[in-house]
Amino acid sequence: MTAFDVLVIGSGAAGLTTALALAEKKKVLVVAKGSLTGGSTAWAQGGIAAVLDAGDTFQNHINDTMTAGAGLNRLETVKFVIENAPRSIERLVELGVPFNKDEDTLHLTREGGHSHRRIVHVNDATGWAVQDALLKSAGDNPNITMLSGRSCIDFITDRHGEKFSGRGRVWGVYALNEKTGEVEKHVARATVLAAGGAGRCYRFSTAPRGATGDGIAMAWRAGCRVSNMEMMQFHPTCLYNLDVKNFLITEAVRGEGGQLLHPDTGDRCRVDYEPKRMELAPRDGVARASEEQIKRYG
């Protein structure tokens, strides 16, 4: 059993960017459920929002975000994310993400809830390009070890009778080796949880099949404060067909003029809900309206 400085649970954008930052001075282990590309990051299509247009401002983006969140957002967090987004895009470019360009500048598209064009993208497969670049960088880093096929079961704490110093501390994770069926113990001085969400707890979802909330449950059992679990995001549009696997229809389709039509009349559904922004309203409102239309008309 090798002890690492830091254990990162999850190999998506959050986990790998954390690992790359920490690996400048620390030995890092990344463990992933299923394949290293099996999380939500690789599934993302549309792109990443950042204030990059000369006619846009951070305040515009902040206002749009607070409106989309119905004012429930934590303002300081919103400001931090938005003000650091341009630098994060630059970092992804440095790591090799081939964002689409319009001559010498990044090409910006538009998505729902945004008052300006802010979305940098790699065609319609942005998430896969980001995942690929991060995995290559992590794979080339001698301070990062990555293990796939590890389903994490529980954090290592004094609850399990482990004799590490520091009551209430987390010292790593117990993980099921999906190939051998054995439970492994991965020990680290610090543990970062980046295991994704719980979208697959619902019958209909565009989330990856591994998004079953394992990490959230582990955190709760270890004594972490878990909040805002009712804030589950649903993507407003996906292809539904009983003969094939359903798949997400990217937000960018509506951002570039795609319309949601009534199946019988052919009229635009959104006119009855938000006639000003129509299909470009924030995701929550569009998803609620889509659900109502499906329940009403099948």
Cite the ranges covered by each PLM segment.
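Core beta-strand elements of the Rossmann-like FAD/NAD(P) dinucleotide-binding domain
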Residues: 2-4, 180-190
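N-terminal Rossmann-like FAD-binding beta1-loop-alpha1 element of flavoenzymes
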Residues: 6-30
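Residue-level detector of alpha-helix initiation sites
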Residues: 12-13, 35, 125, 198-199
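Glycine-rich FAD pyrophosphate-binding loop
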Residues: 23-48, 54
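An anion/pyrophosphate-binding glycine-rich loop and adjacent beta-alpha core
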Residues: 36, 218, 224-298
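Glycine-rich active-site loop/strand segments that organize a redox cofactor
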Residues: 50-81
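Conserved redox-cofactor binding core of oxidoreductases
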Residues: 93-182, 194, 238-241, 247
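Flavin (primarily FAD) binding-site architecture
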Residues: 193-206
